[in-house]
Amino acid sequence: MENKSQKKVSDLKLITLWIIVIFGYLLFVVEWFVIDRISGKPTGILTQSTTTLPQYSGWLSSFFTENAGQIATSSTNWTITLLRAVGSILCGVVVLKFGYRYAVLIMMGIMCVCFPFLIIGDPLNGHNQLTLLRPLSDSVKTQLSSLSSNLQVGQLLGPVMINGKTMLADGTSVELIKGLDGNSIGTAASITGYALFIIFRSTIAIGGTTLVVYTQPAIANLSSNRKKSILSNANLWGFNIGIAVVFTPFLFEQVQQVASQYWVYIMTVMILVVFANLCLFLWFESKIDHIFPQKQTKENMSLTTQPKSIDILKNKTTWKLIGVYGIVLILIVNPLTPAWFSILQTVSPSGSNGLISTGVYTTGLATLAIFWVIGYALGFVVFSPFNKTIYDKKRWMHFLLTANIVVLLIIIMFAATLGIGSAAGFALISIFSFIGGAFAWSLSSSNLILPYEFKDYKKNELPILFGFCWGFGYIAYTLFDITQSVFLQAPVLIQGKGTSILPGVIVSIVFFLGLIALANLIVKFFPACWIKDGDQLVQEMTRKWKLNEWQFVIANKQKNRYSELLK
């Protein structure tokens, strides 16, 4: 009987399939970061002396009256990244259980079932009992004396405090829950609503994260190592383009305000686009022969050797890859977080740690994030061609890891001397964020190409292996996020409000750079890389790269003086 999985699929069809799946991953990245950018602000609490009516926009105003604090805010990320880890680890099991086609459909479907968070986070004209916004009653209006002339009965308002008594705008008495830093952050109902909001929002991450893993079967079945290297490097563009698409519009204050006001409509459109991409995958994948891995059945298990997750986990090389991948994930994601921007602000001199605003554009995390991710454009041209060479990869990995440490130290130095709030300081930090991004993202692409070159793994094992790398990598990132948030919040928790978090910032910086140094040590114990033809070993890569050898940047398939460097 013919084994259907062994039929050759054309590279054109594989590349088209890869485009559809990586587009699904890009949609996840866009959705994920847009939700953060349109979060808005907490409602605050209106009192009889309030003179300015707040603008309620974004989903934060549905659940919180005040900021919940560093640890509480980060705990949301911990929960979500852990769920992403679980999804990534299970994606290998899912693909073996249901086959490649249905595994991708399941994960795209999970992304679509996030839609209840739209209902949970929308006040529904004041009828959503899980939010803080309520229609203003006449009795409450009369007591808000400083605002009464600007108010209308029935308009949505957040909680109010009158004569020491807290109530919703419709007059319902409530008790506010206090956060770790002593702020009153919301009601029991609104915190419950927030928990449900996060649960359904997490399905975007669980499904979307796995899609980048599911690009690997298409890449693994390509006809040449050169094409595999190109698409493996291009995989990172799904994340980087998504970040750039999200952050660029939000550089402008008016876009931020409008998007926060209409966040429900924006997210609805995005979910519909994900569903359309699911339908496109369903149609296109049905036109081609199934690729590895297939659903496990008695028939195909008797014809081929199916990979086993436990065997992959028993391999020591797997854990070395997981260790380095987890640290690289921390390296590429941490500079995109508010915690990193807070670190740069804290080390900046007093008076030079604020934001620069022109009235239209405001400096901040969004600008640095864009420079960080588009740095991969430089890395893609200058550094990524190394992945197509016959050089041993260890020295190259050491070079990139060391370069990242140096660039991050330079960024911190400029923040500490010139300040992130000065034009010169912010400009230099932006430039070196671009350079650092080039090193960091190129490091990530080099790390992702290694499993294709290690003799320990066959191509039908790669989806499971990458699932473990992503899954345990997110666990590592979660542990880092927890540790860093504790470091940053510890001075305030120990000594109270108003305490400088500088000691925690210094510890966080040392911890961050120390992890990168640890990855440098782990790389030393990586096995040798091989040129492979499918699963067949052709030749070990023994040629050692030297720091002054950069001919690979211009080497190509044509017969030129550097063509021998290529696989």
Curated annotation (Swiss-Prot):
InterPro entries (UniProt xref): MFS_Mycoplasma, MFS_trans_sf
Cited Pfam families: MFS_Mycoplasma (PF07672)
Membrane-traversing stretches: 15-35, 78-98, 104-124, 193-213, 230-250, 264-284, 321-341, 363-383, 405-425, 426-446, 462-482, 503-523
Reported consequences of knocking out the gene: Not essential, it can be deleted.
Protein name according to UniProt: Major facilitator superfamily transporter MG061
SUPFAM superfamilies with a match to the protein in the record: MFS general substrate transporter (SSF103473)
Family (UniProt): Belongs to the major facilitator superfamily.
A single Gene Ontology CC term: plasma membrane
Record membrane topology: Multi-pass membrane protein
Subcellular location per the Swiss-Prot or TrEMBL entry: Cell membrane
Entry keyword set: Cell membrane, Membrane, Transmembrane, Transmembrane helix, Transport
Keyword Endoplasmic reticulum: no
Keyword hit for rRNA-binding: no
